[in-house]
């Protein structure tokens, strides 16, 4: 008779765990993740070299939130898992114009790498490659032109891209900072874009 309550608690605990797992899976499915780069690293110890794998992962929700992370482990899957977890903890929110492109052109740099991001009209697509494309795809950007100079290191390219994205602001933020109306900011932006298209 004394074992019955314990058995019931174990059963209820098992049911709770089974009920929790689908919700955690749903949370994971909300994010898109892309493996940008993976390489083997070595640590020199007294007994020789100890090898491990380092992974660089980009995670986004397809609606303007994006983050990147790095992970290191003896096995590739574990390194990717660590990088993915770190990326989810360090996500930033980037305002998108019409849910498809950036509000304005922006620049960023890290180390020797310089990145230029330009907003683009509908139908342009993602004109960028390598690590930068992974950032745009997971973030939900559909039209953008990106260029990176000075480095081919994927880590520096990702950090320079995020430095540029952090500087991206919505018209409402710019208007609040300058003490102007949102309509004036949008009209000036659209006028500059039209002038650039005719040149």
Swiss-Prot record:
The keyword Hydrolase does not apply. The keyword Transferase does not apply. Part of the 30S ribosomal subunit. Contacts proteins S4 and S8. GO terms for biological process: translation. Residues 1-28 are annotated as: Disordered. It comes from the Bacteria. Residues 31-94 form the S5 DRBM domain. It comes from Rhodospirillum rubrum (strain ATCC 11170 / ATH 1.1.1 / DSM 467 / LMG 4362 / NCIMB 8255 / S1). The N-terminal domain interacts with the head of the 30S subunit; the C-terminal domain interacts with the body and contacts protein S4. The interaction surface between S4 and S5 is involved in control of translational fidelity. Keywords: Ribonucleoprotein, Ribosomal protein, RNA-binding, rRNA-binding. NCBIfam families: rpsE_bact. GO terms for cellular component: small ribosomal subunit. Belongs to the universal ribosomal protein uS5 family. GO terms for molecular function: rRNA binding; structural constituent of ribosome. This is Small ribosomal subunit protein uS5. With S4 and S12 plays an important role in translational accuracy.
